[in-house]
Every structure is written in C-alpha cells, then in structure tokens.
Curated annotation (Swiss-Prot):
Involved in DNA repair and RecF pathway recombination. It comes from Pelotomaculum thermopropionicum (strain DSM 13744 / JCM 10971 / SI). This is DNA repair protein RecO. One of its GO terms (cellular component) is bacterial nucleoid. Belongs to the RecO family. Pfam families: RecO_C, RecO_N. InterPro entries: ARFGAP/RecO, DNA_rep/recomb_RecO_N, NA-bd_OB-fold, RecO, RecO_C. GO terms for biological process: DNA recombination; double-strand break repair. PANTHER family: DNA REPAIR PROTEIN RECO. Keywords: DNA damage, DNA recombination, DNA repair.
Amino acid sequence: MKLYKADAIVLRARDCGEGDKILTLYSREHGRIKAMAHGVSKPTSRKRGAVQPFTRSRFLLRRGRELDTVSQCEGVETFPFLRESLERIGYASYVAELVEALTPEGEPNESLFFLLLDVLRLLAGGDAEMLARAFELKVAALLGYCPVLERCSHCQGALAGPLFFSSSLGGAVCGLCVAFAANPVEVNKGTLEILKALLNWPLARIGLLRVNRRFRNRIRLILRQYLTYHLERDLKSYAFLDRFGQAPAGSGAADV
C-alpha cells in the first residue's frame, strides 16, 4: 500500500476499540483525511500527543480501502493555551467542526489550511467570538459562497432604504427585493460594515474591532443562518457556544 506524508491539523479524534482512535485531519497537501491511529490512547504511546485535537503534526500515512492508517506522527504545534479556558476550547472545537462539515475528503485548499492555523494561534489571547465570525466569512469566501455585502444580492442595485440579509438570496437585500427573500433578517449599515471588516481584514487585526453585544448577537444570527442554509443542518458546537453569547463584549482600539 502507498505511503504518503501530510502536514495536518487534527480536527477530531474519536475512540475506536481498545487504544485506537479514528482521526479527522485537515492537511495542507491533501485536504481532509480520515485515518485510523492504532494504540495511540495507551499511556506508553509515543504518538499520543501528536493526535490530540487542535494539534498540528507531521504524519506518515498508509492508504487503505476504507480508512488510511497512521504509520508515524510527530507533533509540531500543540496550542496548549486553548485548553486553559472553556471558551477557547469551545471556539477551537467550533472552527474544527466547521472545516470538517464544509470540506470534502481529498480536496486540498492550502489557503484554508493556513487560515485554520492562524485562527488557532490567535485564539490564545484574541477576541474569540469575533475571530470565529471572521473565520466563518473567510471560509465561505474561500469555498465559493461568500455573501454579497456591497450591493443587493437580488437586483444587484445599490443598498438603499430598509436593509436586510437573506441566506437564500446570498447576502444583503434592499427594501424593494425583500419580498423575494425567505426568512430575511433586518440589518443596518453598521452591521454590514462590521461584516465587511470581518471578511476583509486580516485575522490579526480583528481584535481592533470594538463591537457591542447588540451587533454581536445580530451578526451571530446572520452567519449562523447563512451557514446552516449551506450546510443544511446545525452544528453540534452551537449549543455549547451559546453559553458564551451573553458575555461582555471585549474592548478594542477601533470602531467600525
């Protein structure tokens, strides 16, 4: 069977049998991979640290009919700070679940790999909630369904009058076209400006945004509906993340 190498981030590790785990990886070279790691749960396993969720590791894998098998692995980055708070680990779990849900197996996207790596690094001390919102938009853009925010997504005209966001129409909607939208969410220009900043600013600058709780809740609603529309299902992480939805908004250095 063919051996291959992968620089990959562990999205999920599920127990399987005595001492084994089934890993879901997102790799730079091969995209999403599912692989069996034998004996890694045993206390004496040298591979144990390299297969923990949210760890970047170098893998040597053997191709199989149904599942590939981990032959060797070595941890590169472990992001220990993620395990220091429930909020950080919750958002790390969410971005990992989102990548797993949105990507097919075996289709590499190097930009997505590095975006995931960046957000895991920035969760150390950044605004986890806004980093997650920016990640959602940037992933959608990378995968080809970026929401339209500069004009009406239905008539392509200027955004004037009452403004809305429609998942079914693919973005912002003007007051004249809202009748064509299913379950539109009313927004204002401030909300759209924040969405544009989250989409266009580098992740490292997202901490400069000062966004109050009202805007955060509206943006969370919009993007959750948008992703659910494309995924056609809810993500398991939502229920856990809702526990942090009423946390005080972090202060920053720039208004939008």
